Amino acid sequence: MNLRAIAVTFATFAGANAAVIDHDQVIPFAQPMPNTTLQSVAIQFKPQIYINNGCHPYPAVDADGNTSGGLKPTGSQSAGCKGSGYGSQIYGRAVEYEGVYAFMYSWYMPKDETLDGQGHRHDWENCVVWLDSLDRPSIVALSASYHSTYNYYYPPSSSYLDGNSAKIQYSTSWIVLDHSLSATSTAGEIQDLIMWDQLTDAARTALEDTDFGSANVPFKEDNFIAKLAKAYYV
């Protein structure tokens, strides 16, 4: 059996034994050393997130492919989800798109609640940082997920940037609307970054296959390019 076959067999076995576990028991990936230019640039431009209201980000999947069971929307908007004791996670995926470079950064929250009992289990949000090159990159635009579309910042105000780090806000201001992202002048928190190609096979498979209910993993194969098309700022 060759190495690829062994890897596939192991990933299949690991995925078959993965489970849905409590949201506060998912252990995040430590941010690895970059091995590619895309990985290096992704770290350089990693955004920060300010939680205006609602849950703080949590890891969605661990190295063995176990995924978060999320939280039922009860109590306050941040009840039970003010931060994981194991640390949190930001997920990344990057590609050249329409002559520029799209770096999608995604966060997972265990629930999306507006009022007690109103909302849904699980939330995925993302922003796209658009760069002009990889050699001497600079930010051309920002896109922040807003329900089924995006908020666009082209070019972004300097107040929305902390050096190379975009400042992103997670909030809702309407009882009937779920949480979404926008640019902000307020500094936020950062998490360890794990890129799509740095995840274990078991973790990638879990993110591809797990049903997160009303929330969709934006960077998985079926969604990534379609999301970039919506996020594109031109």
UniProtKB/Swiss-Prot annotation:
Keywords: Glycoprotein, Secreted, Signal, Virulence
One GO CC term, this protein: extracellular region
Cell compartment(s), UniProt: Secreted
Positions annotated as glycosylated: 35, 66
Residues of the signal peptide: 1-18
Highest taxon listed in the record's lineage: Eukaryota
Pfam family, one: NPP1
Broad class of the protein's primary localization: secreted
Keyword Repeat: no
Motif (Hepta-peptide GHRHDWE motif): 119-125
Its biological purpose: Secreted effector that contributes strongly to virulence during infection by P.capsici.
Family listed: Belongs to the Necrosis inducing protein (NPP1) family.
Matching PANTHER family: DOMAIN PROTEIN, PUTATIVE (AFU_ORTHOLOGUE AFUA_5G00600)-RELATED
Domain topic, free-text comment: Key residues/motif important for the effector activities are degenerated in most NLPs, including the nlp24 peptide consisting of the conserved region I (11-aa immunogenic part) and conserved region II (the heptapeptide GHRHDWE motif) that is important for phytotoxic activity.
Protein name (Swiss-Prot/TrEMBL): NLP effector protein Pc576423
Source organism per UniProt: Phytophthora capsici
